[in-house]
């Protein structure tokens, strides 16, 4: 995989309204990049994305954002659901009735207290791994990634730098 040696890295963007706006403006571009990216070996892309993810996790504090917690419908594992309900002092049935629909937790997450998760140390796997950049087979998950780019500053910045590092010939 050939990477640009001298890359002009886009300015780090953390303003959520700007990220949403830029994601909408880059919508067609992101879909074209998605197709173009598939020419690369998945393992090579996974390694590069992992590096970018770690870079932006070090630069951006999730606990100052919590946009994912305010925006997403999240599906927990049954075992996690039991632990969450217990932590909140509720039965699973009461938690489901109060906080869920169609098997997913309604936003904003009921465990969100301001911008902090009240069960952060015991948060579910889906929350712990969000925005899922370091999971294998990045190029097979690009529809979800593009959705996350509009919500998460870490995903947005990593995705924009990925375009720059790969010298994507923008349309």
How should each PLM-predicted stretch be described?
Residues 1-171:
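Short loop/turn segments that flank or connect secondary-structure elements
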């Amino acid at each position: 995989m050939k990477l640009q040696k001298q890359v002009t890295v886009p300015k780090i963007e953390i303003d959520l309204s700007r990220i949403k706006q830029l994601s909408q403006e880059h919508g067609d571009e992101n879909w074209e990049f998605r197709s173009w990216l598939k020419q690369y070996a998945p393992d090579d892309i996974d390694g590069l994305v992992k590096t970018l993810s770690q870079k932006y996790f070090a630069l951006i504090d999730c606990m100052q954002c919590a946009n994912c917690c305010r925006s997403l419908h999240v599906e927990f594992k049954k075992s996690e659901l039991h632990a969450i309900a217990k932590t909140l002092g509720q039965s699973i049935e009461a938690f489901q009735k109060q906080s869920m629909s169609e098997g997913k937790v309604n936003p904003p997450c009921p465990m969100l207290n301001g911008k902090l998760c009240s069960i952060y140390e015991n948060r579910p796997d889906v929350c712990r791994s969000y925005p899922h950049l370091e999971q294998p087979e990045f190029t097979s998950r690009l529809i979800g990634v593009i959705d996350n780019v509009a919500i998460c500053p870490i995903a947005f910045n990593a995705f924009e730098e990925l375009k720059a590092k790969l010298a994507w010939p923008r349309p």
